[in-house]
A protein has these predicted regions:
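Surface-exposed beta-strand/loop patches in extracellular or lumenal glycoproteins
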Residues: 37-58, 130-133, 139-148, 419, ...
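N-terminal, polar/Ser/Thr-rich
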Residues: 1-35, 110-119, 131, 135, ...
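Short acidic/polar inter-strand loop motif in beta-rich domains
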Residues: 98-105, 470-471, 536-542
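Long, ordered, helix-rich scaffold segments
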Residues: 350, 522-870
């Protein structure tokens, strides 16, 4: 490695010495060599002798002019261009060359298939031209694009088209202008040949907005759902948040090569095609809902992210935590609130809690960063959203919306901080959030322990609630947090007991603010069954000694669907933990009859929402189960999970078959009622696949071949792979033959291959690196084959012989120079070595040491490896 990457610290923030108010860009486009001319209007705000330090990577400088005169007072350093002796106000003209075709990191301007496109967040604009590449520099952008008309008939950039023309040699040009000042991370450019779906949306003030969705030629029939989702997002943001769109045009472009999910560039969103393209035979129900959510997320950024942006990248959760909260609310308002909440909580418990316990632990507002791309994390996004949700819980919807309005009044058109947001919420609601602010600075997952006591003579019920946050890799000392802790108490008939104290009603959300607190309730006429941490009111781990009877009671009687699911999760957790210990001692699975009966009751409940029943019947993933243990035994977890599946499949075989048959649908609609029925039916099929082999094989094969939609086809295929049924290989081959030309559809197949429980799965994965549909230059393919193996097949990745680790080292060695961002995502399971036994730790450490010795190790990997080895 040439030099050790340097860390940046939040407390070192300084306002820039120069601001750029306007920038006029011209791109003379060519895949091999693009010429960029940047004309910036700059103003000095710092000391008179302060040089202008511009960021730039992989650029070839052609010329520099200041106020039209050639300028020689400059020097190039690694990653920077430093210009001296500048007047207070000036026009800076820089011409440079870049090569989009050579840009395999997919940051800046790069080639995706036959198109050219950009990705500038977080620090990609410096790969396009020299500039103040930081979010607190907001300029008005005008962009002129010149290109070959036959190769690139569509030339797109932010804002409205203001001019266009034809040139000789078959070239043409377009000029676009974005009237809203923005940081350069929101700049976008796309050039290519597309099919276009056009529509309009009339805002509540009567303005007509042109909507344009650009997809690869031949994919137009997969675009309508994304357009519907966009219009739903625009309407919802007006209705729920009072926020209206502000430009005359909104464009979305779907590209196949993309490091992230999607990008909210002002007026021109660039999307991974995974989150745009859907047709009933290519996309599952989950894909449809993910598209709706991600389209919503990027649209909602127009206000929370673009109109008000981040002062610096340490404040990333200001825009991302808030916008994830908004997209979760959007999905919940349009669909099932309980199912969406369950999905979010699965992510927190299975993935974010693991991040908190890893070497990369950080608060939602990090204090120290080496490579900013490494902080687009579950902590910043999902835990960030939980922190916003807690504010919403403490304030209520009305005060929260007042806080949002005040936030926009104060900060519209500027770059703000997390503190600015909390201050607006506090000022608008008169709720003191001073203690609550600690969530922004303290990392880790708090553990909340609850003990209760009931006195039948005084009819008093007491809860003693204590909290502690274990030390994390980045912080040894922890302080008590302000935890909104929601509860409900039930009597023996399933009625909710009103919470009272001293004759007054008590709010069901308890404010837990100390290391230990006691809450006493009066007039509790019966020993209650408590529902605790209702709706997952805070991102914490809960410890309470439940009896099986309490949990089965809540599964049946809790009035809140989330509480019913959560009780089932707790019941399963009890027996998973017990059986992992039994497995390690060589004993068989033990599952009491009443546990199977509790799940039978769910299947026989005619009033239950099928979508909720499906969630209750979906066992926690291996990653969720892992979080129940200090030291993770991935082999034991996989085997216990399978044994549990087989036991329930045998105990409830008749019920599973009956529910499977009764939920058959003839036609396919993306409708929440139908989605619930399909999800329940396919959850039953999953168990049936682990039952009697002949019946399983017949049912699964028949569903696969009769399916008129991808949801049912993939559910059958997935069941065949998970249960290793005789029909597996034939069905997998049929799928490959049918879809091998469609990368997105093949991603589902690659995931099934790489997460298979088969003994030879690693050998299979290695073979698939040469598959006709696989490419090491496409992030979606890499994530589906290599990422899913390392991250979602722990039993195989953590094989005793270390073969899984060695495989990942080989892949990361290739990706380190090819695409460091993707490499950095894939290394996550390897850096969590301290959660495993000594033998595995030793092998994982050796693998990390091997990577650390790579020549030209990227900053992205360096940061994670050094933290893991510390």
């Amino acid at each position: 490695m040439t030099q050790q990457p340097q860390a940046k610290y939040r407390h070192d923030y300084r306002a820039p010495d120069y601001q750029i108010t306007d920038i006029d860009l011209t791109f003379d486009l060519d895949a091999e060599k693009t010429v960029v001319t940047a004309i910036s209007q700059a103003v000095r705000h710092g000391a008179p002798d302060a040089p202008l330090r511009l960021d730039g990577e992989d650029l070839t400088l052609v010329s520099i002019h200041v106020n039209d005169a050639p300028w020689t007072a400059y020097k190039e350093e690694e990653g920077a261009l430093i210009i001296s002796d500048l007047p207070e106000r000036f026009t800076l003209r820089i011409v440079n060359e870049i090569s989009p075709a050579a840009n395999t990191a997919l940051e800046g301007l790069y080639q995706s298939g036959d198109a050219l496109c950009t990705q500038c967040e977080a620090e990609g604009f410096r790969h396009i031209t020299w500039y103040l590449d930081r979010p607190d520099v907001l300029a008005r952008f005008t962009t002129k694009i010149i290109a070959d008309k036959s190769k690139y008939p569509f030339l797109l950039s932010n804002g409205n088209r203001v001019a266009q023309g034809e040139l000789e040699n078959g070239r043409h040009w377009v000029q676009r202008q974005d009237p809203f000042p923005k940081p350069c991370y929101l700049f976008a450019l796309v050039a290519g040949d597309f099919d276009v779906l056009r529509d309009t949306f009339t805002t509540r003030s009567g303005r007509e907005v042109a909507l344009e969705l650009y997809v690869d030629r031949g994919n137009l029939d997969r675009a309508p759902w994304a357009m519907t989702s966009l219009k739903n997002s625009m309407k919802w943001d007006e209705t729920r948040f009072g926020l209206e769109y502000d430009l005359d045009i909104y464009m979305i472009v779907a590209v196949d090569f993309f490091n992230m999910g999607a990008m909210e560039n002002k007026g021109l969103n660039i999307f991974n095609s995974k989150y745009v393209l859907a047709r009933t035979d290519t996309a599952t129900d989950k894909d449809y809902l993910d598209i709706e959510r991600v389209i919503g997320h990027e649209y909602f950024h127009n206000w929370t992210g673009n109109r008000v942006t981040c002062r610096d990248w340490f404040q990333l959760s200001l825009k991302e935590g808030l916008t994830v909260f908004r997209d979760q609310e959007f999905s919940s308002d349009l669909g099932s609130r309980a199912v969406n909440r369950i999905s979010n909580v699965r992510t927190m418990r299975g993935l974010q809690f693991a991040e908190d316990a890893s070497p990369m632990a950080h608060p939602i507002r990090p204090d120290k960063v080496i490579e900013m791309n490494n902080f687009y994390t579950l902590t910043v996004y999902e835990k960030g959203a939980e922190v916003i949700r807690m504010i919403h819980t403490l304030l209520g919807e009305e005060n929260f919306q007042k806080g949002m309005q005040l936030y926009f009044e104060r900060h519209d058109g500027s770059a703000a901080t997390c503190d600015d947001f909390v201050q607006a919420m506090e000022d608008a609601s008169n709720v003191d959030l001073s203690h609550f602010r600690r969530w922004y600075s303290q990392s880790g997952t708090p553990i909340v322990t609850v003990k209760d006591d009931y006195n039948p003579e005084t009819e008093q019920y007491t809860l003693t609630i204590s909290q502690r946050t274990p030390a994390t890799a980045d912080q040894a000392e922890k302080q008590p947090l302000h935890i909104p802790f929601a509860i409900e108490l039930y009597d023996n008939e399933g009625n909710v007991i009103p919470l009272q104290k001293g004759g007054h009603p008590v709010n069901a959300v308890l404010n837990v603010t100390q290391a230990e607190q006691t809450f006493t309730f009066d007039n509790v006429y019966f020993q209650p069954v408590p529902a605790l941490l209702c709706e997952f009111s805070a991102p914490v781990k809960l410890e309470y000694k439940w009896s099986d009877q309490q949990l089965t009671f809540l599964m049946r009687h809790a009035r809140n669907d989330f509480s019913r699911w959560d009780a089932a999760q707790s019941l399963l957790a009890t027996y998973i933990k017990l059986n992992v210990a039994r497995h390690q001692q060589g004993q068989p699975l033990s599952l009491p009859v009443h546990v199977a009966d509790a799940f039978r009751a769910v299947l026989l409940d005619e009033k239950i929402d099928p979508a909720l029943a499906a969630e209750i019947l979906t066992l926690p993933s291996a990653n969720e189960i892992a979080e129940l243990f200090e030291v993770i035994d991935p082999i034991a977890i996989a085997q216990v999970r399978e044994a549990l599946t087989r036991t329930l499949a045998a105990e409830l075989a008749d019920e599973f078959l009956a529910i499977y048959n009764v939920n058959h649908l003839d036609e396919y609609r993306v409708d929440h009622g139908d989605i619930g029925k399909r999800t329940l039916r396919n959850a039953c099929l999953r168990f049936l696949a682990f039952g009697e082999t002949e019946l399983a094989n017949t049912l699964v094969s028949k569903q696969y071949r009769d399916a008129n939609n991808m949801t049912d086809a993939l559910a059958a295929l997935s069941a065949a792979v998970a249960a290793q049924l005789p029909c597996r290989d034939t069905l997998m081959q049929e799928y490959d033959d049918k879809w091998h030309q469609d990368g997105l559809v093949m991603d589902k197949w690659f995931i099934l291959q790489s997460t298979s429980p088969a003994e030879n799965v690693l050998e299979t994965v290695r073979g698939l690196l040469k598959h006709r549909s696989f490419s090491m230059s496409n992030p979606n393919r890499i994530r589906s084959l290599i990422g899913a193996f390392a991250g979602s097949n722990p039993a195989a990745f953590h094989a005793q012989d270390g073969s899984g680790y060695q495989f990942l080292v080989e892949m990361l060695t290739d990706l380190n120079s090819r695409n460091p961002q993707v490499a950095s995502r894939l290394i996550e399971p390897l850096i969590r070595l301290k959660r495993y036994d000594d033998k595995r730790q030793e092998k994982m450490r050796a693998a990390l040491e091997q990577l650390k010795g790579l020549e030209n190790l990227s900053g992205d990997l360096y940061e994670k490896i050094t933290k893991a080895l510390a």
